[in-house]
């Protein structure tokens, strides 16, 4: 009788051990980068900023852009940054920006931020775009700037017109 009781207790203990290791969390793991391709990495001394889009490139016209900030020391992606950006076109005699949205975090627990930029002009041999990204993490301010490729699009993707109020619209 003792032998059978020991076997039964051992079996129950093993069953409880396996049962307690199971997970009731049936929510699927979300891949933040699904359908996105990396465009470029912009670096400074502390972080690497990864730019993404659906096509993996920027072009003249409307561009929906996502980004992630990676800490160079820990290798972790930042989840609590406040991000702003400023695209600048450097021409022979002047510099100008273009229409852009704010940069917003996509999900509370995620690492991806997104916004859009409408490049009104394409780059050429002497004129180019750069993207300055200003961001704050836990009260500390950081900046990273890099030249970006903005070739002409195959089709017209942006147009401007003057409204009845004499304001120009894109």
Predicted regions and their residues:
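First exposed extracellular module after export/assembly in secreted or surface-exposed proteins
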Residues: 32-170
């Amino acid at each position: 009788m003792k032998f059978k009781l020991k076997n039964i207790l051992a079996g129950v203990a093993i069953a409880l051990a396996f049962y307690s290791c199971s997970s009731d969390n049936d929510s699927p793991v979300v891949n933040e980068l699904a359908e996105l391709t990396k465009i470029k990495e912009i670096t400074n001394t502390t972080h690497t900023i990864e730019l993404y889009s659906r096509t993996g490139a920027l072009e003249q016209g409307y561009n929906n852009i996502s980004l992630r900030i990676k800490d160079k020391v820990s290798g972790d992606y930042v989840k609590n940054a406040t991000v702003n950006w400023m695209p600048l076109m450097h021409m022979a005699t002047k510099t100008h920006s273009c229409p852009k949205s704010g940069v917003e975090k996509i999900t509370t627990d995620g690492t991806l931020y997104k916004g859009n930029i409408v490049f009104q002009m394409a780059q050429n041999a002497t004129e180019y775009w750069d993207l300055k990204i200003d961001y704050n993490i836990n009260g500390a301010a950081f900046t990273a700037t890099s030249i970006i490729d903005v070739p002409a699009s195959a089709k017209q993707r942006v147009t401007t017109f003057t409204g009845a109020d004499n304001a120009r619209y894109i």
